[in-house]
Each structure stands twice: as C-alpha cells, then as structure tokens.
C-alpha cells in the first residue's frame, strides 16, 4: 500500500527541472520517513540499460511504437524495483519524468494514440499517479538554446529532433494541464533558477504542509 508521497517533475527539453530537483533537496529532507530522487528512463540497472538504447544518438531508425514500449518497460521495472518499495516505506519520492512524458512525447510529439498510451501507463503502473506533478514550462526555442549553451549536458537522440516535435511536446503538456489542473501544476521555468525553486517549494508546501 502506498504511504509515501510521489512528486514528479515534467517539462520540455531545457526547462531546467533536473537543476530544480537538486536545489529542492535541502528543503525536503524532513518529509515522510526519508527522501529519494530518481529519474525516467532509468533509476535502476535494467531501466538504465534501456535508457541507453532509447537515447543513443545513432539510433535514428527507432520506430515510435518501439520507443514508447521501451519507455513503458523501463517504467515498470523502475517502479517495482525502486519506487513502490520506497512509497511503501513512507518515503517522499522525487521523480525526474514519469507517465506524463509518454503522453507528451510519444502521444503529441510522435503522433501515437493518446488513449493507447494512457492504457499502457495504467498497465505498467497499476494505476499509480503522482500526488503532485510540477510542470516546468518554457518557450521551446529558449529551452533548446539553454541546451546548446550547456557544456555539461550530453547530447541525446531527442535533442537532435526538429523544432516541430518539441513544439508538439509542449502543447501536449499544456493539454495535460487543462485536463488535470489539480495534480499538474505549472511553474514558469523562464525565471531565474532561485525563483523557480522558490515557486516550486511554495507549491509543495501548500499541498503537503511544512515537514514536521
């Protein structure tokens, strides 16, 4: 049974969610019985191996359905091996991407049927959804420009996609925002990092209170 708190972070490329996640850690240590951070795809050995296959820049021939099914397989392994045990122990789990990425990227971005993706998500997660999703919204061109300037970020296959795909991905996220505004909360990611972190922390504290 789920006793902990699951918070996912979502956004288009270059939104800075990974940096925000790291900056939030000192403020969230006292929620639940502990705190873990993890990512999709990845988080455990099998899922990290799948991640390498998905993001390898040379895998340009990958079919959209193949890509989706690899993400779903990674998701299931990650959940059963790491996320669900942590939640059962009452921990706060911060996830860099989760189910909404599949809807935005493979649904809106690749043009696959969103209902099919939602069914696969349901199948892989047994219906688990985040208690809160922070969606970091940024203009697509600004986000991609950030990536181009970053010396530490390795280029992956999705970075090589055209602007049109990334625009569709953002529209997918905004569609989720319209559909699930209670769970899916927008943060303006074009602001300085410290302001984005402060806004994110305020949303978390409003939803779950201050840690005891």
Curated annotation (Swiss-Prot):
UniProt keyword ATP-binding, yes or no: yes
Xref: Pfam families: Thymidylate_kin
Annotated residues for binding of ATP: 11-18
Source superkingdom: Bacteria
PROSITE patterns cross-referenced by the UniProt entry: THYMIDYLATE_KINASE (PS01331)
Gene Ontology BP annotations: dTDP biosynthetic process; dTTP biosynthetic process; dUDP biosynthetic process
Coiled coil: none
Gene Ontology molecular functions: ATP binding; dTMP kinase activity
Reaction(s) catalysed by this chain's protein: dTMP + ATP = dTDP + ADP
Keyword Translocase carried by entry: no
Keyword list, A-Z: ATP-binding, Kinase, Nucleotide biosynthesis, Nucleotide-binding, Transferase
GO cellular component: cytosol
EC id: 2.7.4.9
Its biological purpose: Phosphorylation of dTMP to form dTDP in both de novo and salvage pathways of dTTP synthesis.
The family this protein is said to belong to: Belongs to the thymidylate kinase family.
Protein name in UniProt: Thymidylate kinase
Origin organism lineage: Bacteria, Bacillati, Bacillota, Bacilli, Lactobacillales
